[in-house]
Amino acid sequence: MMFKQYLQVTKPGIIFGNLISVIGGFLLASKGSIDYPLFIYTLVGVSLVVASGCVFNNYIDRDIDRKMERTKNRVLVKGLISPAVSLVYATLLGIAGFMLLWFGANPLACWLGVMGFVVYVGVYSLYMKRHSVYGTLIGSLSGAAPPVIGYCAVTGEFDSGAAILLAIFSLWQMPHSYAIAIFRFKDYQAANIPVLPVVKGISVAKNHITLYIIAFAVATLMLSLGGYAGYKYLVVAAAVSVWWLGMALRGYKVADDRIWARKLFGFSIIAITALSVMMSVDFMVPDSHTLLAAVW
C-alpha cells in the first residue's frame, strides 16, 4: 500500500507523457543508430528528475490542492505521506536522476534537466503559479525540457534541432494548459490561481489558444524544413495542426465551453504523441538538400 502512495505522489501519468517526448527527441537525434545503454540511462534519468519535480510540486501545492476538486485527494493532502518524508523522497529522486544524466548521458543533458527542474519547482511552483498570469508561459519551458534532453543526450550539443524541439513543445503546452484551465475553471477560481481564463476571461483565452496553435503549427514544420524530419512527419504535423486549429476555431461558437475545452485538451495529447512517434521513425540527416535550402 505504501508503494502505491509513493508512486502516486510522483504523478506517473506526467512521467509517462514526458517519456514519450524524451523518446521522440532521442530517436530523432539517433537517426536509426540507437545507443541502447544511453537510451536507458536517459529515460530513467529523466523519469527520476520529473518524479522529483512532481513530488516537490505536491509538497509546495498541498495548501491549494485542498481547495481543488481535482487535487483534494492527493497523497500529501490526505496526510498519507508526511511533508518531511516527501521532501527527503523528492531530493533522493532528484539526485539519482541528475547523476544518471551526468554520468550515463552527458553534462549538457544533465544541465538541461537542472534548468527544467529549477524553472518548474523554483520559478513556477514556488512563485509564478500563484502570483502571475504568465505562470503557464514560464512553466511551458520546463515542460519542453524532456524532448530536448533526449535529443541532446545523443548529440551532446544544443543545435537548431534542439531549439526547434524546445519551440514545438513549449508552444504546445500553452493551448494544452489553457484548455485544462477552462474545463477546470471553478477549481482554479476556488484556489485563487491566476490562470489566463480566470484573470482575463475565457474569450481572451480562446484567442490565445488559437494564436499559440498557429505558432505551434509553424514550429512543427520547421523540423522538416530544417532537414531533421522527413515528409511523412511533415504530412502528419500539418494534418494534426490543421485539425487542432479547427477545433480551436469551433470554440468561438460552442454552447458549452467546458465540453469544448475537454475535447481540445484530449486532442492535444493525441497531437503531441503523434508528432513524437513520427519524429522517432521519420528522421533525416541534415545536409544542404533540406527543404529550406530548396526554397532559397
UniProtKB/Swiss-Prot annotation:
This is Protoheme IX farnesyltransferase. Its EC number is 2.5.1.141. It catalyses: heme b + (2E,6E)-farnesyl diphosphate + H2O = Fe(II)-heme o + diphosphate. Gene3D superfamilies: UbiA prenyltransferase. The chain crosses the membrane at residues 10-28, 38-56, 79-97, 108-126, 198-216, 229-247, 269-287. Converts heme B (protoheme IX) to heme O by substitution of the vinyl group on carbon 2 of heme B porphyrin ring with a hydroxyethyl farnesyl side group. Pfam families: UbiA. Residues 29-37, 98-107, 217-228, 288-296 are periplasmic. Disulfide bonds: none annotated.
